[in-house]
């Protein structure tokens, strides 16, 4: 997961120039030049840090959050499209849905709530259009609902959205927030000047320490969320920044943001996995009352499955992460509200022992996590991060439970309790997590823990052979076990019903079958087979268990054009004109290349585009229609031979991945492919070269960022000389976009 793109998710709305995104933060910190620093200080009339910054505040911040904070924040769903009514409507939904009563009690307004300049006295000014009654009024309304009032600012000269930052105004802003009766401050870290001779670590420490002391000096208890570590993610000083964040604040954002609402389904799931992956190893840097924050919960947003939102809720709770929803709660589905409001899962997160769970077992595509709970139980999560269903098996001993002969497993999603002698196992669908609360002990008339495991034993093409096993992991044997197999329409099974008879405690029974499906379409097709076993378990009565198998079929696309899945170029015309600027989404934030700006650079639909002797044909697709591939491991049919395979593309992030070339003789070769971000980079990252530069881009509200170059790049991977290409398999890296491929 470390190579996944840091996607640009900051909205471009209401901007005239781009600003550093909240993803890829460390790059932005390191790239800030002395000239930029000096210009920012002069322009803002601010006093910058001295050559040797004074020591940061050493008074430890009080423990205002004995359990992880819970609440709602607008950013991931609304971005800058916020208003007083939007915030208060979601607050009312927190109350009416019952989520507030379950702990979601803090409502935070993120970036873009203020005007672009301070008043004559240097105070922040709420945007009179978005917040006509002011921010104090918002706080009053929230408090009247029994909720807490959260607000956003930035430690730099400007927020990530380009609004006034708290740099040079820490005490003034803290006093203003206290006057408004703010209960929670999220302090971001965009646009922090780092003068020559100083380390970014020291500068950030000083600034965040200054705000910490300023908040203390107000006398008002304000929960302090520190974003500094996110700007050092993966850097050598990352852990050190987290360590001092735990001294100056209550919680800290330590890495990339989760995806925005406009992101693709793959982008959202990838961001959940990415944020989980950087957060889960940080348990040693967390302590009760000091929380690692891997960002918002996405339940209620579009394009995520029920399994995916339950996975995020499960993993965040086991990691003792803040539970902060970012969605439109006024329109959230019953399923999303049930996920956010699951009392048993919330109890795992809010457990008073206050410890982050850890990985106790890993395998190909899965993790097992265990979290100690205050009453001696353990929360055990079986996380299937892969794209295929699988049975995950561990033991009570590996999960850290005391030795014993019996354990009770409560599935916190199905609410079913079973009994095991020590094995903890479940068939887990793709992208899903089974979350158990495990108690050392026994109970009468409780169903034994059972699990179904599918094992593929052979087959090719559309035909596969399988062994299906029913395991009894409990103290009670099974009788009359019957197995039923279901397949999608168009599939044929050699058998759909098998009698398994008796299964002894600790034993298993198996069946074999053959499945044959129709020819798959180009791309990746996932077919699910389901086995359901029904049985009687002595005095515990009748029971059942189900398990899935995934059949993944990869069929190459006949051409790159046939794989196009992203609208990267739009017209500058307003809706409802064909191909208008609202129809694109190159970067996950609704932004796209301007067809007119590209045309001015010589790039038009179907045109030949050349650089350094390499020529591509730009897609002939009309603006507003798919014209590039957002990479997801697609396989493309291609023919030709040469020394290099050249790609025309760009990125909405910073990522690279392996291209696999398969030749007609069955051999393969590989090469690494990456492009610079489409904007605001040196243009030579990953060995790429700039092919064309457009003067501006389109945003969801129209053309913007004039004078800023949005580029297309060329890059290549080597080919084996003398061999003919049959297929090209692209990387699984959704930040990378490819418009054309040619052989040289």
Stretch-by-stretch model annotation:
Residues 4-6, 13-56:
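Secretory targeting and sorting signals
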Residues 86, 90-200:
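Aromatic-lined carbohydrate-binding/catalytic grooves of carbohydrate-active enzymes
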Residues 169-172, 221-328, 349:
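Glycan-recognition surfaces
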Residues 316-319, 324-326, 362-401:
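Carbohydrate-binding surface patches
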Residues 376-382, 461-477:
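Short beta-strand elements of extracellular/lumenal beta-sandwich folds
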Residues 420-448:
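C-terminal beta-strand-rich structural cap/linker in extracellular carbohydrate-active enzymes
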Residues 519-529:
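Short glycine/proline/serine/threonine-rich loop/turn segments at secondary-structure transition edges
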Residues 547-744:
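N-terminal/edge-of-domain interface segments
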